[in-house]
């Protein structure tokens, strides 16, 4: 994404003074997230003929793994919403207790939100951006009630977010650059959100993407007749909350510029990520170069001469020739005067394993996942759930990072409810209470929780139906039914055995 081109476009057309320098940091983070940093992973080595060749440095791609782990910790299939108004809850989540229906299901919200957390954690910021398709507007561009309309969401990382106005740390106006396909060709959708006198104006512009001679993508604005159906150039709404919400990793940015944007979760761990890849590459190279080698006197070999008159020696075993190495003199050998000698290099597995483990521990610590998030023992990885020594660090950092995500989730849900009521005519309450129920299995595992609930049920501290619901994923009604059936069966058994056999 050539975001600099759109910054230049906005500065020119809207007389802004946006700066593109901070997006250079985001590009570096993107390279680390992909596991391909040219200055690090493109190694220069001397070839036998004296030329310089490139070798790809092996990479564990830990920055991406770290972002995936944070996304799975913070927003996963066990994250649920609690909405006070029943009709509003049914509209968003569906009527079942598993919250698998409603508008959020139509939008594939949870899987997209999980991906957005990963993108926000590598890029420094994520944005939920709402739009309404098939909206009716008057001649002035004001949005009118549109029962035929449909709510849509975009999920943008920091490289697609251009803050325009920031008040007390909160982005109030912004532009969003979203990539898409139109007619099988790449295109870009630029949406600008501005506020004037309590009214919000959303401007939509489309650009087609072409490749310049230099290889840099060029963007040319499309005319209205070529844009997607169901979109308008501009709409204005009054009394609405922001149609976007942003969140970032919960760390104070120590980089200059980029007001309104955050920094990557691994921004402070780039040296540790580099150490991980160097240690892993060294481990890999030791294994690759550590095969058996046989040094032999060239007089043992059959000779042949090519058409240019150069003599070549044929190794004793042409199939496994990579293990044979010629000695330059007929008398020579390594440490002995023998015609041939076998050599088995030491792989140094213990030292290499420890180097990789030390680097992973540093990476885990710097990315706020605790000191031993990634610990390999006998071929298995021990996560922080089992390693109690680092659990407290993880718990504190996870709780801290839930705050901005919860704010963003509630913000975009209120925008969706406002549009649903005021534009689509849905029977919802935008002011209804909304809270997020987080998954805390990183603190106590599901098995530990179930076992404790079972003990409490046996002791009479909690109803048995609660244990059944948790153990077998039952609804409250199903759990009560199971409890009643179990009680009836026990009474039947007592009646059958009353008075003896």
Region spans (language model):
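Extended, helix-rich architectural segments
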Residues: 1-172, 498-501
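Activation/maturation switch segments at domain boundaries
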Residues: 452-501
